[in-house]
């Protein structure tokens, strides 16, 4: 049997991994500017953590979760999204305590798992960057978090990003709209897809989010949720819009956007861009003021977003964005003969300890093959080390582009390689 990776997973090899590391690094730097700290939660959770928070009737829970019973007969699931585990951790670790400064701002980067049909930018194991902010009901928190995502996309060089915005209102306005939507959709129930017929009974707002053609036709003239906002909900949404305008962040109102998870209220949003004449969501999130309480904590407002790393990298590639990934070695050491093996090892370590990236030959190859490796690795400087160099206590350094050479002592290399390197590559 030929062993291969499971369907819907990927091996991220070193060249690609460098791009991942760059994007993750830019995200970390951006989040730090907004005073976010990293949190790392387990890759698996108790089933109830996800099912109760995400919603028993969502596609994630009914169709997409990897869940199983462990040897202790505990119902476990691989995490399909990041918010619920972070909220569970927030409550379990009592980050709501008065001595903890509010708002609590956290970000995460890690693997998520959903059993779905693999396609471009969508896998069964995928990677997500997300942020969660706890303790502020201020609409400025909504806008700051949206602005942080917008700032990240600007730094990465993504073009043509559009912010789609909607409000689900509070519990009262959402309940009023839910009934209005049921009244609107019920007469055309038979024209809906099978999934949306089920959603109409369980969670009618999810019909608005359907990608099926017949459902899109059915909801084309559906009542707008914004017409059912009470005074509190309207004031919150008006404040969000005015603050976005103050920051010159353009947006469009999308009243059919409801998000795929049940815990949202008030502001929800998506950032969308076009790739190959198709719209792709890069990032999505919103406000969830009841989730901490649902997990047994005190009533605590929350706001956050998540974005898929695979999809983000796909968009960067499709848009032709060149990521400034560092390539190549600083130094390649060509080793001539077994007698030079120990000296080469010592020299390699001495240069590395001074902050340089170094590789050497371990295979005892001819000098021509070693120089070819130096070219392949894009080494800036090549050091040739053989029996004569060891006897003299000196090494020959060559600029790998200009081919200019210089001879320096081992002592100089071991104590002040930075000066030698700068002189060699100037």
Curated annotation (Swiss-Prot):
Q: Which GO terms describe its biological process?
A: histidyl-tRNA aminoacylation
- Reactions performed catalytically: tRNA(His) + L-histidine + ATP = L-histidyl-tRNA(His) + AMP + diphosphate + H(+)
Q: Which UniProt keywords apply?
A: Aminoacyl-tRNA synthetase, ATP-binding, Cytoplasm, Ligase, Nucleotide-binding, Protein biosynthesis
Q: Which organism is it from?
A: Streptococcus dysgalactiae subsp. equisimilis
Main location per the UniProt record = cytoplasm
The family database entries (PROSITE patterns) matched by this protein are listed as: AA_TRNA_LIGASE_II (PS50862)
This one is known as Histidine--tRNA ligase
The similarity comment for this entry is: Belongs to the class-II aminoacyl-tRNA synthetase family.
What's the short name of a Pfam family annotated to this entry?
Answer: tRNA-synt_His
How it assembles, according to the record, is: Homodimer.
A Gene Ontology CC term for this entry? cytoplasm
Which EC main class describes this enzyme?
Answer: ligase
MF terms from GO for this chain are: ATP binding; catalytic activity, acting on a protein; histidine-tRNA ligase activity; transferase activity
Annotated compartments = Cytoplasm
Assigned EC number = 6.1.1.21
| Family matches, as InterPro entries | aa-tRNA-synth_II, aa-tRNA-synth_II/BPL/LPL, Anticodon-bd, Anticodon-bd_dom_sf, His-tRNA-ligase, HisRS-like_core, HisRS/HisZ, HisRS_anticodon
Q: Out of the domains of life, which is the source?
A: Bacteria
